[in-house]
Design a protein with these regions (language model features):
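An accessory alpha-helical subdomain
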Residues: 166, 170-172, 177-214, 225, ...
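Catalytic cores of RNA-modifying enzymes
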Residues: 1-184, 188, 231
Length: 250
């Protein structure tokens, strides 16, 4: 965090991390769903000498960034931040995937960097390598460069949760495909991962109603074994596969 940074924090809790961020950043906007905390926190921050923290009482899934026209149309809350803002979050496990998708895929204005604490299993999926890929892996690695930072054992929390957590950083990057080609990417990926135990050629053949031999040929063109499963392909191979399918099916 640099002195010129504006930070969006999701779920400040009692504000300990919020104040640490505010010591380094130009400003911090904290989104808090709990009405009691949202009422208490502004007074707490001012009493501690912080005048660069704004608390927004709202559900993060009902907030948009720099989209006032969408906010008005959809009755959402709009938050105005610089285009290079950074996001820090201790994400509730129940909304992790939905929340990550909103900020990665641009349903709200995308941050330049995300640092999130998530369930350890989710952190491993975000940063997975070929052989263990998933739809969430593709999402994170298409829109960002994710890095597994550190484990946070359950024993570090009170009350102690049932699972361990981990910290992941996601440096966002410009998508490499056009909007139309992205539709192809997610269509192929959804079909490909529809049955993880089946070979990818079987899933794509059945889902797209094309010959299995044709799919095998397409997989060979992206340097992949024809008996592979969806989780075996890297993000770059999925992107290449989009071009191969488009060239042969349009």
């Amino acid at each position: 965090i640099q002195p010129s940074d504006e930070v969006l924090e999701i779920g400040p809790g009692w504000g300990f991390l919020t104040m640490a961020l505010a010591q380094r950043a130009k400003g911090v906007t904290a989104i808090e769903l709990d009405p009691l905390l949202a009422e208490i926190l502004p007074t707490r921050f001012l009493a501690a000498g912080f005048h660069n923290i704004t608390v927004v009482h709202h559900d993060v899934l009902s907030v948009v960034i720099n989209r006032p026209e969408l906010a008005e149309k959809s009755r959402l809350a709009n938050i105005t931040l610089p285009s290079s803002y950074k996001l820090v979050a201790n994400l509730p496990y129940s909304i992790t995937s939905v929340c990550l998708k909103r900020f990665l895929a641009g349903e709200v204005a995308r941050p330049s960097l995300m640092v999130v604490m998530v369930q350890k299993e989710v952190a491993e999926r975000l940063t997975a390598k070929p052989g263990k890929m998933s739809l969430l892996s593709l999402l994170s690695q298409y829109y960002s460069d994710p890095h597994y930072i550190a484990d946070v054992p359950a024993a570090n929390f009170w009350p102690k949760p049932q699972v361990d957590s981990a910290i992941v950083s996601l440096q966002l990057k410009q998508p490499s495909l056009s909007v139309e080609d992205e539709k192809w990417l997610w269509r192929l990926a959804r079909i490909g991962f529809s049955s993880r135990r089946k070979m990818l050629k079987n899933n794509l053949s059945a889902g797209l109603l094309i010959e299995e031999s044709a799919v095998s040929n397409y997989l060979t063109q992206v340097r992949q074994n024809v008996n592979c499963r969806a989780q075996d392909l890297s993000i770059n191979q999925w992107i290449e596969l989009v071009g191969v399918f488009k060239n042969n099916m349009i």
